[in-house]
Amino acid sequence: MTYFTNTAVNIEGNRKLRTPQIEAYIKIREFFSDPEHREALVILPTGTGKSGLISIAPYGVSQKRVLIITPGLVTKDSIRKTQEVLEDNFWINYDIVFSSKDIPVVSEYTPDISSEHLEQSHIIFSNIQRISGNRKSALINRVPEDFFDFIIVDEAHHAPAQSWRDALKYFSKAKVLHVTGTPYRGDAQEIPGEIIHETPLSEVMRAKYVKWLRKETVNAHELYFTTPDIPNKKLTKEDILEFKDKEWIEKSIALSPECSNDVIEHSILKLNILKEASPKVPHKILAVGCSITHAEDLAKWYEAKGLRVVIIHSEMDDEVKADAFLNIENHNADVVISVNMLMEGYDHKYLSILAIFRPYRSLNAFAQVVGRILRAIPENEITAFEIDNNGIVIFHEEIGLNPMWEKFQSEVDRAKRTINREYTFTDDYYRERENFLRSEEHTSELQ
């Protein structure tokens, strides 16, 4: 099976692709041209075209089948949307292949897929749960170790987990490309693979590939605390710190109805301002709660102020969850409340205001949730970029998120500075240019 090496594709000079996608692809192809190179890491910010990069990465690299591993169902669906043979097919819409006959055969791995179907596929994608494990239906128990030549790990910060290690160990002969938008892990484990390309968030902000970002914190009330240790007494933050830690304070603030309502009111204010400035764009608030019960309370508080609310969490039945996503896509919601469900892979470009009602300890988790509002709204839909693609992150001043935000603030500041980029030269470009110059020289002699 030599589809990925024999099919003519339009990638390096393709004006429909984004510069970070092309630059990353060039680095991928050059890296794996050395047989000694087996494992690489590419960092591409959310909203920059990671799914598109995954779709072009195998060309000129893979000698046979490709396996794409995703961490969960939502991320898997994002990959599937890119690769479906429908009107949204990436290879056709972005002029990657020159004929619909050249589209690769793509299959989602399911327990009931036939062996014949697997063998005829060029690309197989699945969430990690269906690939690893002791179940007879797991992919590693159905195909030989050399079935794939190239494995692409989406959301690579999960790769150090045991289930991922098991899959990569089984297919150890394959080349491995890790792709992530957030190169941080909360458990201090290093993401595998040699970093061969990293596009800074500031660069894609400057190019307007993603929304700009800004932060606004609220602290409308003077904070007082109560505790059973000292009943009937209002305690200041300084009083509490004498016998409680900072984490206790941050959790208390996150779960406080009064503090939550401060964030709710500010997020609604910003939504109203946004809709007044750009009434045709269905902007929405993404609110992130601590738990399902907390999310239900947030929903009641938002609804009490006249907003339409959709809740998404992992305990919902599939049918209810599908209805919830449909309501979001059909703009039957002003507020989407999530409990660790939308953190990866869900792309809805109209999520423009992020209201955070919980503390974070992991920079990866914080980066994931901020990434959900990064996707830019297309130019043909907006009033102005600085209005519609200017994401707002809102949280309480005392919830402990300011240190997390500093990472993004540095990127925001860098994005405001104009940088003249150096040219990127490849060996292929050099050879082509050399031939061109020779022909020019030859023409001059004839004259």
Language-model segments: which ranges?
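Walker A/P-loop
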Residues: 34-57
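Conserved Walker A/P-loop ATP-binding site and its immediately adjacent core
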Residues: 56, 60-93, 290-293
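Inter-Walker segment of RecA-like/P-loop motor cores
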Residues: 89-135
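SF2 helicase catalytic motif II
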Residues: 128-131, 141-178, 182-183
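Interdomain helical connector at the RecA1-RecA2 junction of SF1/SF2 helicase-like NTPases
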Residues: 188-280
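Long, largely alpha-helical accessory region at the distal end of helicase-like NTP-driven motors
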Residues: 253-255, 259-262, 266, 270, ...
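Conserved helicase motor "Helicase C" RecA-like lobe of SF1/SF2 P-loop NTPases
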Residues: 290-313
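Conserved RecA-like P-loop NTPase helicase motor core
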Residues: 308-420
